[in-house]
Regions:
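Common nucleic-acid-contacting/processivity interface regions adjacent to the catalytic cores
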Residues: 285-352
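Short catalytic/ligand-binding loop motif for oxyanion handling, primarily in non-cytosolic enzymes
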Residues: 118, 196-201
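A short, hydrophobic C-terminal helix/tail in secreted or cell-surface proteins
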Residues: 353-357
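Active-site-proximal helix-loop-helix substrate-binding element of RNase H-like nuclease domains
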Residues: 142-148, 152-164, 168, 185, ...
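Long, highly charged low-complexity segments
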Residues: 45-108, 112-117
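Conserved RNase H-like, two-metal-ion catalytic cores of nucleic-acid enzymes
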Residues: 2-44, 93-188
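Short secondary-structure boundary/capping segments
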Residues: 123-127, 200-213, 326-330, 342
Length: 357
C-alpha cells in the first residue's frame, strides 16, 4: 500500500510524507513540472476552451515559476496548467485511485492549558506559562500528558490509557514535549479551536522559552510559516502553518461538514449535543483558582477535553471525511477547507485523465 499524507513544492524540491509498502517515509524529491501554451498544431492536450495547447516541461520548479512570472501579464499569451506543483507531483506519482489507510496515519487530538495571570493567553504576546499538554492517538487511544506537577488519576478518567510525564518546570515540559513530538510527529493534528489557539500558542511559547527557531522543530521539514488569518467580523488572528503536518481543527470541520447551525460552538455544548456528555466542571470561580487549588482535577479537565474531540471523531468521522475528499481530489488534507484548491485539484485530475484517453 502506497499513499502520500503530505506533498508540496518548496524551492526546487517536492516535500513528501507518506506510506510506501506499509512503512512511513519522509523525503524531498526533484520534480520537473509541466505548463501549457497555445499551439497551432493538433494536440491531444486542450484548454478549457477546447483550444490546442502544447506542453512545456521544465527542469525545476524554479524554472517553471520564472517562466510563468515572465509571461503571466503578456497579452495573448495565456499559460495553462496547474502552477501548484505539489498537485502535479501527486497526480503523476499516484495515478489511479489512491489506496489509503487511516490506521497507518498518525492522527492526534491536542489540548493545552496555560496560566491566566493576565486574562486569556495572547498568541502575539505569549506571556502566560504552559501548564499541561495532552495528545491522544486516534488509532490506539493512547493518551500522553505533560504537566508541571505530579498527577494521580481518579475515577474521572477511569479506563483511559494515560501516560503522564511530570515536569519540574515549563522549560522541561516544553523540551520533553517537543522531543516526544519529533518522535511521534503527527500527519494530522486536531482539537477544538486548535488552529487558532492551541497550536499557535504552543509554537509561540516554545520559541519564547526554548529559543529562537526552536518552534520550527514541530515541522518534520523544519519549515514553519506564521501568518494572519481573517476571523469573525474581519478580526485577524495569528496562525502557524507547519509544513508536513495537516491541521484539521475539529471546530472548523464541524462547522463545514455538519450543515447545521448551533446556538453555541463551545466544546461543552457540542459534546452534550453530539455525545450526551459534558466537560469536567472546575468547581472554582476563576481558572486561576482551579489550577492553583486542585491541580489533579485540572489535569483531568485537560485530558477529558482532549478525549471529547477524539470521541467526536469516533462518532462523526469528520477527519476521515476530509481525508476521503483529499484523496479523491488528490490534494492535501488542509486543502478541503478551500473550495478553490479542491476544485483546482479535481480539474487537474480530470484533464490529466482526459489527455491519457
Amino acid at each position: 500500500m502506497n499513499f502520500y499524507t503530505y506533498a508540496r513544492h518548496y524551492g526546487d524540491k517536492i516535500l513528501v510524507r507518506g506510506v510506501k509498502d506499509g512503512k512511513r517515509f519522509i523525503s524531498k524529491h526533484n520534480f520537473r513540472p509541466t505548463l501549457f501554451v497555445k499551439s497551432d498544431k493538433p494536440s491531444k492536450y486542450k484548454s478549457i476552451y477546447g483550444e490546442n495547447v502544447s506542453p512545456i516541461q521544465f527542469e525545476s520548479n524554479k524554472e517553471a515559476t520564472a517562466f510563468y512570472d515572465r509571461y503571466k501579464d503578456v497579452s495573448n499569451f495565456p499559460i495553462f496548467g496547474q502552477d501548484y506543483y505539489g498537485y502535479q507531483y501527486i497526480t503523476e506519482k499516484y495515478p489511479g485511485p489512491v489506496e489509503w489507510d487511516a490506521k497507518k496515519c498518525k492522527i492526534y487530538s491536542i489540548d493545552i492549558e496555560t496560566t491566566s495571570e493576565n486574562g486569556f493567553p495572547n498568541v502575539d504576546s505569549p506571556t502566560e506559562k504552559m501548564l499541561v499538554i495532552t495528545m491522544q492517538d486516534n488509532n490506539t487511544k493512547k493518551i500522553t500528558t505533560f504537566g508541571v506537577g505530579e498527577f494521580t488519576p481518579t475515577d474521572n478518567v477511569k479506563g483511559l490509557d494515560i501516560d503522564y510525564i511530570a515536569c519540574k518546570d515549563e522549560y522541561t515540559l516544553l523540551s520533553k514535549f517537543l522531543e516526544w513530538w519529533e518522535q511521534n510527529c503527527p500527519d494530522i493534528i486536531t482539537g477544538w479551536n486548535s488552529a487558532l489557539f492551541d497550536i499557535p500558542y504552543l509554537l509561540a511559547r516554545t520559541e519564547r522559552i526554548l529559543g529562537e527557531g526552536e518552534h520550527k522543530r514541530y515541522s518534520p521539514f523544519e519549515l514553519v510559516n506564521k501568518r494572519k488569518v481573517r476571523f469573525a467580523a474581519g478580526r485577524e488572528m495569528t496562525a502557524f502553518e507547519i509544513t508536513g503536518v495537516a491541521q484539521l481543527d475539529y471546530l472548523d470541520l464541524y462547522k463545514k461538514f455538519t450543515y447545521v447551525t448551533r446556538e453555541s460552538y463551545k466544546l461543552d455544548f457540542i459534546a452534550e449535543t453530539e455525545l450526551g456528555k459534558n466537560k469536567l466542571e472546575s468547581g472554582f470561580d476563576t481558572f486561576k483558582e482551579f489550577y492553583e487549588k486542585d491541580w489533579n482535577r485540572f489535569v483531568e479537565y485537560n485530558i477529558i477535553d482532549t478525549v471529547i474531540v477524539d470521541e467526536l471523531e469516533d462518532k462523526m468521522k469528520l477527519v476521515e471525511l476530509a481525508m476521503t475528499m483529499a484523496y479523491d481530489a488528490k490534494c492535501n488534507y488542509n486543502d478541503v477547507f478551500s473550495a478553490v484548491r479542491t476544485w483546482d485539484s479535481f480539474c487537474l485530475l480530470y484533464t490529466s485523465d482526459a489527455a491519457d484517453e
